[in-house]
Amino acid sequence: MIMKLVEDLLNKNLDIDEYVERTYERIEKIEKKIKAFITIRDKEEVKREVREKLKNPKGKLSGILIAIKDNISTKGIRTTCASRMLEDYVPPYDATVIEKLKQEGAVILGKTNMDEFAMGSTTETSYFGPTRNPWDLERTPGGSSGGSGAALAAGIVDIALGSDTGGSIRAPAAYNAVFGLKPSYGTVSRFGLVAYANSLEQIGPMAKNAEDLALLYSIISGDDPKDATTIHFEPQVPEKVELKDVKIAVLKDIVEASDKPVVSIFNSTLDKLSSEGAIIKEVNLGYAEYALPAYYIIAMSEASSNLARFDGVRYGYSKYSEGNWRETFAKNRGEGFGIEVKRRILLGSFILSAGYYEEFYIKALKIRRLIKDNVDNILKEFDLIASPTMPILPPKIGEVVEDPIKMYAMDLNTVIANLAGVPALSQPAGFYNNLPIGLQLMGRYLSDYYIMAISAKIEKVLNLYDLTAPIS
């Protein structure tokens, strides 16, 4: 638990040098095997900063090392988005969430690997190479925040930040047996996040237990004048919650589309919650078959607009400067972006072109509204919506990345929360042949603290928290 770790550091029950050395020894031992990081800061520099933070302790995270997904701007620390396009980019400013973490005494250990520009579900589209799952090195850690998930599972850090556009925090949380929250839309500033799809994405916390997840969320959340999409809200922290009489809706049409091993573990989890007094009932989401197409149409359309700025003139890879503008633009973007990013830019541009805008984009927005209305209606009757986080077990490296349809289908269970704007978290539900499987909980808008409080009860019932993969 982070609060205990801070206390031990402040009371000198844990030596600062020992804490930092232990972390870097772990990195030295396993980082080459898993490739969780793109950039790792100098050990002595980190040690000095930890000492400084503990000399003048001002916050809840005094001296604590944290891993940051590499699409979140960090002043003076390279931020690549796992792309050749931004291979050498060093931001001159911090994202709002980074400012908040620093104010609370956190120290950045490094920037984690991810799918290029957060476009992917396996952390295989990174220009710097794939991240491997610490539970099984032949498999992916999920994506796009796979580096953050792997760093947690491998025992390198206790807390991390990710971003979630259609499941990019929850997928790695599920596949790495850790906890991850996609916050209610607008509760965490996106200022300093390199945008993929503005109307869907949120920065969110990742941790090894529900308590640390809630602590990290409490620090990074809040309105921000630099981000017009943030809202002012009063945190609704429940004093006490119990599983008894909690009404949980199970999305039948989502569960039925999941693989048998996943459903088996999920049903076993539901049985345990039922024995604790939870009231569980199956419901149909409705429009489930349209959720993925609607999500990808919206996300790709927004991506094609957001990534237009990376032209090799104003931003990004600029190897070519001679010739006419069209030639240099095409060459720089052609070499600067990877295959998956180019695929999504092209599809997004096509969708937004004359004659197809109303046929695809407007229809996708209508489906989004229908799904949001259905989610809201279900949550008027129930306290929570539950489903497996991912429909399949962690795929092997190379198994889905070459097949876009297979990779996109992995997001079926998670995109619903992004389309509806509601909070959703993933926590460990169990293992099948030593492979982690996640439980997803969705709640009403702004019920983030409530679902994390329920998650804290569930982790104790399942006895699945503070897990570390047996990798050495």
From Swiss-Prot:
This is Glutamyl-tRNA(Gln) amidotransferase subunit A. PANTHER family: GLUTAMYL-TRNA(GLN) AMIDOTRANSFERASE SUBUNIT A, MITOCHONDRIAL, TRANSAMIDASE. GO terms for molecular function: ATP binding; glutaminyl-tRNA synthase (glutamine-hydrolyzing) activity. Belongs to the amidase family. GatA subfamily. Pfam families: Amidase. It is an enzyme of class 6 (ligase). The active site is at residues 69, 144, 168. Heterotrimer of A, B and C subunits.
